[in-house]
Amino acid sequence: MFSIWTILRIIFSIIFTVVHIYFTQFINSIEEKKNCPLSTGWRITNGKLISSLFMIIGLINIFLPASKFLSTIPLIGSSYVLLFVIALFSELFIIYRLVDNIGDDENSNCKVKGYNFIINFFSDKDLSQCVFYTIIVSVLFFYL
């Protein structure tokens, strides 16, 4: 019925979508905090936009292998892959910086509850690991 690669693609796309829903909720919870210096600015706006876009891409990829199809078109495919990689790195960088800034004393009003996993995951990471995760997720996304 389905090949193993199709099942893996569907599972990966579901996980990809759920993770980006979680990212969006995390960013929204920071935005809703009163007296939080992090609740406004380019990180919140762009983070919500990028993670919402990735949610839509993940949902589409569950039902149609659109990413695999688009990446094979010569001119459009290379641009799509490059934009995907840049957007994914930007999102991981935004989440990384938000988590890093939440720990500062001046941002003590920005503590969010229910997001310990994301805070613990990104608190001990650095920029090179964001690049590493971007490469891994991009390869999985386009080759599954």
What are these regions (language model features)?
Residues 1-144:
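Eukaryotic polytopic
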